[in-house]
Amino acid sequence: MHEKNPKFKPTRLNFLERLYLPEVLKGLGYTFRQIFAPIFTTEYPDVKWQPPAVFRGRPVLVERDDKTGERCVACGLCSRVCPPMAISIQAEETELEQERHPATFEINMLRCIYCGYCEEVCPEEAIVMSDEYDITFNNRENAIMDKSKLLVPVARVQKRLDFLKEYKNKVRRPEEQVSNLEV
């Protein structure tokens, strides 16, 4: 086919190009330059990485401000929106200010895909994605976390709660824009 096309002219490689020596030297030069580049890895077990507020780690339940229990009102939205169905809730009524709270609240961490849908849909900001990323289990039973393992104080997830408030304010339209649309 090359002989029939008059525009095609095969390029002749010289001796060094046929040996691929220049290309090998270019690769070695790049490798040598990388020896003196700054190190960007951390020595993990000794040095822990501090994730930013945007990071979605293990989901946790947030305590109420008065530390009398969880913020959760057992509405069940998080369990309905969870794609892998990792969350299970059973509600019971209480005599406290809120009418209901979860009698059982479990998250199967083997099923959780850390999507954050449960956090987005929660009306009480009761379930939040924490900054915990080093999650290990000895057996499958330990991977199912109940209320006692999930409950954390507000101070521990305050950075994430502040991020969520800022994020939700950016997503929602200000009231002035909504009133202008109605006119």
Swiss-Prot record:
* UniProt key word Membrane: yes
Pfam families in the record: Fer4_7 (PF12838)
Cite the EC number.
7.1.1.-
Q: Which InterPro entries match?
A: 4Fe4S_Fe-S-bd (IPR017896), 4Fe4S_Fe_S_CS (IPR017900), NADH_quinone_OxRdtase_chainI (IPR010226)
Q: Which cofactor does it need?
A: [4Fe-4S] cluster
Name the enzyme's class: translocase
Q: Where in the cell is it found?
A: Cell inner membrane
* GO-annotated biological processes: aerobic respiration
Which residues take part in binding [4Fe-4S] cluster 2?
Answer: 82, 112, 115, 118
**Would the keyword Metal-binding be found if you checked this record's keyword annotation?**
yes
* Classification via Gene3D superfamilies: 3.30.70.3270
Q: Provide the topology term for how it sits in the membrane.
A: Peripheral membrane protein
Q: Which GO terms label this protein's molecular function in UniProt?
A: 4 iron, 4 sulfur cluster binding; iron ion binding; NADH:ubiquinone reductase (non-electrogenic) activity; quinone binding
Per UniProt, residues of the 4Fe-4S ferredoxin-type domain are 63-92, 103-132
Q: Which reaction does it catalyse?
A: a quinone + NADH + 5 H(+)(in) = a quinol + NAD(+) + 4 H(+)(out)
Q: Which SUPFAM superfamilies match?
A: 4Fe-4S ferredoxins
Tell me, in one coarse class, where this protein mainly resides.
Answer: membrane
Q: How is the cofactor bound?
A: Binds 2 [4Fe-4S] clusters per subunit.
This molecule's function is given as: NDH-1 shuttles electrons from NADH, via FMN and iron-sulfur (Fe-S) centers, to quinones in the respiratory chain. The immediate electron acceptor for the enzyme in this species is believed to be ubiquinone. Couples the redox reaction to proton translocation (for every two electrons transferred, four hydrogen ions are translocated across the cytoplasmic membrane), and thus conserves the redox energy in a proton gradient.
Task: Please report the name of this protein according to its UniProt entry.
Answer: NADH-quinone oxidoreductase subunit I
User: What gene codes for this chain?
Assistant: nuoI
